[in-house]
Amino acid sequence: MALRACSSSLVARSAARSVQPFRPAAVRPARIAPVARKTATVVCSAATDAPAAPVAEAVVGEVKSGVAHLKFQRGSADKIRRVLDVIRGRSYEEALVLCEYMPYRACEKIIKCLMSAAANAKHNKGALKTKLVVSECFADEGPVLKRARPRAQGRANLIMKPTFHMTIRVEERAQ
């Protein structure tokens, strides 16, 4: 008898929980993220399927930018992102100074990639390093190296050694 009372209360509790109804993609609000293209058209559809209206059809001049990739580096992508979030949107020189004085090991790899991106912008597009801004930077997870550590009685523990891929883009500041 006690078992029946217990099971019926579980059913009542689970029925009382609020269950979110499934909403199809057309009804769900989309992330609003305008993307500027060469013709300066804003690409966005917020909660509707209507196409976005062009903002201005003026052709934007070529932006002097440089990109650098660092791939298959040992370390956690989360620890890299912690520093990348700080330097995003800052000037090249300010980002270098910040990374030099931060107490994280990830900063060494970020400085290497940042200097490479600035050198690419200067060499390929003729950009001035004093006018560069970190416009985009992100880190993705790479493959995980799996190793075994011997334990007692013939067992083994799995050791995970994560890797990451990092991309930094610098652009010349518009005056």
From Swiss-Prot:
It comes from Chlamydomonas reinhardtii (Chlamydomonas smithii). Keywords: Antibiotic resistance, Chloroplast, Plastid, Ribonucleoprotein, Ribosomal protein, RNA-binding, rRNA-binding, Transit peptide. GO terms for molecular function: rRNA binding; structural constituent of ribosome. GO terms for cellular component: chloroplast; large ribosomal subunit. This is Large ribosomal subunit protein uL22c. This protein binds specifically to 23S rRNA. PROSITE patterns: RIBOSOMAL_L22. Disruption phenotype: Cells are erythromycin and tylosin resistant. Ery2 mutants (formerly called ery-M2) are cold-sensitive for growth at 15 degrees Celsius. Resistance and cold sensitivity are recessive to the wild-type allele. At least one mutant (ery2-4 formerly ery-M2d) has fewer chloroplast ribosomes than the wild-type. Part of the 50S ribosomal subunit. One of its GO terms (biological process) is translation. Residues 1-43 form a transit peptide. Pfam families: Ribosomal_L22. Belongs to the universal ribosomal protein uL22 family. It is found in: Plastid, Chloroplast. PANTHER family: CHLOROPLAST 50S RIBOSOMAL PROTEIN L22-RELATED, LARGE RIBOSOMAL SUBUNIT PROTEIN UL22M. Its main location: plastid.
